[in-house]
């Protein structure tokens, strides 16, 4: 079962109790405290010898805290990757950053798994193998706090979408948005919103909430649409390690590690419960 809003809030409540950690120095990768046993679900032949290699697309605040690879030491997907590396038997993890177009277009090789808040779709399954899903996501609408859009006005508003995303497909095919402005990456789209070049941006609720937090509330998630989407990691088709990566993720879900990471990085970073964002009808 992927991480849901209910799991996030429950784990956040537990963390808020201030439960004491066991004595002794914790195992760490970056700023991530590792909870599993090293090598408990081993991967003998990773993409690069002696390390675990992860592909992503930056920036992605809260999921990867930092705009450049050398600055990222924590975040939801970073620490999730670190835990996977550890349980696979590695204390060295390399992160490769690429554009979203290259990431989702399967233009990069030489990695073990890629995490970039990627929705699992049938079309993408033709290109990649996906890991077990680890997060449930709906589609959010981000607008300027002083000029919000609503369920009706969004149909005629100037909408921004990111190329190659499920948000772009949803806006055009489900909402019937005509002539949206298309951006190559999230940062360009959100910059256009802040500059008033678009009225709203449509992308995953989790991503819009992170941007709301990053702007200090000058941008606001005014609504969301229920989609039933889930996030998964991308893997090169047919790699014999793919099943093992999914097994590690499932072990993290089962033992509560995923929920704790979600509470620490997502719930705390957003500063609000995603369930409080009203749902729009398409």
Please tell me what each predicted stretch does.
Residues 54, 58-62, 70-87, 118-120, ...:
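Bilobed "Venus flytrap"/periplasmic-binding protein-like clamshell domains
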Residues 43-44, 75-77, 125-134, 219-223, ...:
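A structural signal for short loop-to-beta-strand junctions that line the ligand-binding cleft
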């Amino acid at each position: 079962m992927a991480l849901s809003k209910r799991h996030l809030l429950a784990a956040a409540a537990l963390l808020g109790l201030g439960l004491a950690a066991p004595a002794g120095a914790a195992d760490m990768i970056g700023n991530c405290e590792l909870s599993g046993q090293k090598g408990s679900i081993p991967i003998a032949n990773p993409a690069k010898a002696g390390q675990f290699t992860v592909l992503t697309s930056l920036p992605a605040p809260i999921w990867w805290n930092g705009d450049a690879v050398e600055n990222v030491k924590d975040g939801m997907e970073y620490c999730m990757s670190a835990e996977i590396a550890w349980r696979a038997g590695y204390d060295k993890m390399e992160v490769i950053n690429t554009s979203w177009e290259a990431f989702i277009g399967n233009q990069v090789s030489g990695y073990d798994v890629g995490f970039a808040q990627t929705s699992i779709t049938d079309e993408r399954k033709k290109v990649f193998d996906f890991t077990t899903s680890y997060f449930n996501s709906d589609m959010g609408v981000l607008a300027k706090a002083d000029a919000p859009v609503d369920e009706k006005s969004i149909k005629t508003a100037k909408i921004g979408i990111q190329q190659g995303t499920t948000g772009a497909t949803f806006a055009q095919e489900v909402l019937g948005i005509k002539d949206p402005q298309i951006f190559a990456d999230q940062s360009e789209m959100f910059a256009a919103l802040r500059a008033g070049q678009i009225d709203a941006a449509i992308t995953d609720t989790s991503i819009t909430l992170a941007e709301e937090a990053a702007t200090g509330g000058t941008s606001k998630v005014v609504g969301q649409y229920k989609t039933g989407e889930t996030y998964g990691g991308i893997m090169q088709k047919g790699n014999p390690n793919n099943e093992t990566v999914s097994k590690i993720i499932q072990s993290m879900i089962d033992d509560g590690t995923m929920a704790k990471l979600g509470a620490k990085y997502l719930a705390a970073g957003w500063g609000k419960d995603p369930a409080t964002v009203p749902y729009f009808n398409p």
